[in-house]
Structure formats: C-alpha cells, structure tokens
C-alpha cells in the first residue's frame, strides 16, 4: 500500500457535483477498489475550485483509471467536473 496525495482542480461551479459522486454508493464502490477509504483524508480550497485527498492506495492502476477517464463509472462525472489533477507519492520521514 502507498500513501498518495491527489490534488484536483475543478471546473467552475462543479464542487457539489464532484462531492455528490464521491459520496454516492457508486462513487464509494469505485473508491474502495482503489484505496482504504477509512484512511482517506480530504480538504477543499475556500473557493471550492480545488480538492486535495491523501489516500492509502492498494491498486494504483485502478487509481489512474479512476482519474484519467478510462474507468467507465467515473468518466462521465470526471469529464464534467475535473479540469486537471496532480498525483504525488508520499514518503514518511
């Protein structure tokens, strides 16, 4: 398992749609395929234009698929709400 930080830039006015999907049963099922959701930490910028999640990933390929649009479940939502994202691997010191 790896600690990963994902920073996502959202399209204007799409925060609620993004969070609605992430917290839906469908979104949670996809997220469980990627990471231990009980260990996920998230935050949002004050203007709701960006989100940041620290996740404990157990399937990196599924994570990339979830974010890059090749996952058929997340693709329609992410095409609508996501402007860009960055992924960082975290190392404990």
Description of each model-found segment:
Residues 1-73, 83-93:
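Short S/T/G/P-rich N-terminal loop/turn motif that feeds into the first structured element of a domain
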Residues 77-79:
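Short, exposed beta-strand-loop hairpins at the edges of beta-sheets
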């Amino acid at each position: 398992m790896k600690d990963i930080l994902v920073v996502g830039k959202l399209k204007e006015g799409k925060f609620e749609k993004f969070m609605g999907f992430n917290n839906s049963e469908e979104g949670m099922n996809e997220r469980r395929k990627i990471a231990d959701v009980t260990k996920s930490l998230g935050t949002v910028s004050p203007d709701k234009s960006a989100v940041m999640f620290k996740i404990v990933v157990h399937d990196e390929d599924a994570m990339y698929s979830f974010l890059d649009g090749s996952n058929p479940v997340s693709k329609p939502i992410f095409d609508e709400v996501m402007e860009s994202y960055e992924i960082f691997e975290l190392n404990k010191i």
